[in-house]
């Protein structure tokens, strides 16, 4: 297999010839060509050369500068954040390099304990580690209750000069409902302290398929044909 990742490099006007040449090389060596993680424009370039396109899911990206809890659509989130703040929870935002090394063992223990016995099912783009000295530019978001106990944490990896992508999300079973939403909202509010403007909240695989399944009242088994229908399309 010849697996490409992302859009072709260079001038978009040259993408067509780049894809054509790549497919020619793949045929010469008997490789099955495939691409993952392309934009709409990139998908069109590959489709124009005869490749099929499958939508695998959606990436939720927040414009931190424009993020607001106002408006009717944000009412559930706004209520959750108010509830958590009334419970006395405070949120701290800092780069990993600003964390005292003595704090990391406790943070790592909490993250592992809150995961429980469930296996780690992270994404291929996830670091799979927490507190490594090499990750100093990562962003740590912590929620601390009125007694000073840690009840939630998020870790984001750098994404370009002013972005961050969610890498780890953990909350205590005893944390008030809405603590995760509160951490995200507070990170947007404190964005300038860590120089962020965009936040990726990670990737939802087959979101449209499962949304359609919910609309149709489909259970896990009856959703499968819907998934395959989308794959064939």
Regions flagged by a language model, labelled:
Residues 54-56, 85, 195:
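A short, structural micro-pattern
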């Amino acid at each position: 297999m010849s697996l490409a990742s992302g859009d072709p490099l260079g001038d978009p006007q040259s993408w067509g010839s780049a894809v054509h040449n790549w497919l020619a090389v793949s045929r010469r060596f008997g490789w099955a060509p495939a691409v993952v993680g392309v934009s709409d424009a990139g998908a069109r370039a590959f489709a124009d050369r005869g490749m099929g396109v499958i939508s695998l899911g959606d990436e939720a990206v927040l414009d931190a500068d424009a993020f607001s809890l106002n408006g009717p659509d944000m009412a559930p989130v706004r209520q959750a954040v108010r509830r958590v703040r009334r419970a006395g929870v405070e949120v701290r935002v800092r780069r990993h390099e600003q964390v005292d090394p003595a704090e990391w063992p406790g943070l790592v223990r909490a993250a592992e304990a809150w995961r429980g016995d469930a296996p780690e099912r992270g994404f291929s783009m996830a670091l799979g580690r927490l507190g490594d000295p090499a990750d100093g530019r990562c962003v740590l978001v912590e929620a601390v209750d009125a007694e000073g106990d840690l009840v939630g944490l998020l870790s984001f990896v750098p994404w370009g000069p002013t972005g961050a992508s969610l890498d780890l999300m953990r909350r205590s079973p005893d944390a008030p409902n809405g603590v995760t939403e509160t951490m995200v909202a507070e990170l947007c509010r404190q964005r300038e302290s860590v120089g962020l403007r965009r936040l990726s909240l990670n990737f939802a695989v087959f979101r449209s398929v499962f949304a359609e399944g919910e609309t149709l009242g489909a259970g896990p088994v009856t959703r499968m044909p819907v998934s395959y229908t989308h794959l064939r399309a």
